């Protein structure tokens, strides 16, 4: 009986020693079974912003809108076509019905000034709208960028766990073959290892999907990925105050109101009179006089004459309707601005609460659970090697470690997303 106990103890020590040797071997990290590499050129977030500013189709369309508005400013001084009339009446002498007439109609000068101011205000509104598009695009890029970092960090965690599970799957197999455990323990270890690799495949697929989204946002065919190696929290600065009037959205709405004010003034110029100017020059064809009219009194040469006319708007019902319609447009835009301001201020309060909750959660995992999870993993590994705990207890410890690491990654990601949302609202992207 003593000989059998000694033999059992010896076998236990051999298995434990061999398991310890396996733990000291270099970690394969599942490299032979799973390719976790993500192809692509490494780029920083600022490089993504710069690339999108040049290549993104939304930005290009916004720039074209600004250019169009700038070109339209040249239409402010549009004049009616100059009318040129030639008349020749052989039945008269050298009167005004024998000559050239140049006629030009034009609006009152204030009309052109108002129109020019309106077009300049519309150009500024287009520039503000482009800034809104830029801020929104930057927020989308930053969101995708940090989501890629988050998923890459999760993949790193799963790779480390894969190494541990693969080693202990081998240990469970040896213990089963040595008769120290049942086959169920080995099968459970192998299942855990395979499930972890399936999770790794899902995470890698999500990274590749996010990479495609980022490429679309940058409008590039070249695969790109974040330059950072580790997932870190974004440095949050000056996020405690929010002024809608100073945000990109607020400035755009204010510029729209200014443009509509200018439009109202331009519509009111319809009440102003119009002007017309005519210049006439004598043109008598001396060789063509079928009625033998005496033209001797016009023999001293040609003469010039002019005419100035003023158009008075006696029927101005259409102009009044245009002014009222422009005023309604302005009232509607003001209501929309107040509505947007209410929504943005509400969103800021919600984002602030979200950021505070994410910050508290992040501090908790950074101060306590990181070291705690590492200690659990280390102690459970030693105890399992020495046969002090069962594989089920060890797996529970591993799952607790994974849970803590993943929750810490979730906390960083949630914090970063909250910061990005506030930066988008405040226009600090």
What do these predicted regions represent?
Residues 2, 6, 136-248, 351-354, ...:
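Periplasmic alpha-helical coiled-coil/stalk elements that build and connect Gram-negative outer-membrane
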Residues 2-10, 16, 30-37, 407-429:
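Acidic, low-complexity, intrinsically disordered peripheral segments
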Residues 15-26:
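Bacterial N-terminal signal peptides
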Residues 32-42, 79-118, 278-318:
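Small/polar, glycine/serine/threonine/aspartate-rich low-complexity segments that form flexible
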Residues 41-55, 186, 190, 220-284, ...:
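Amphipathic alpha-helical coiled-coil scaffold segments and their short linker/junction regions
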Residues 50-61, 67-81, 100-118, 128-135, ...:
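A glycine-/polar-enriched beta->alpha junction
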Residues 61-76, 133, 137-156, 174, ...:
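Amphipathic alpha-helical coiled-coil segments
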Residues 117-120, 183-192, 324, 391-399:
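Short, charged, amphipathic alpha-helical segments
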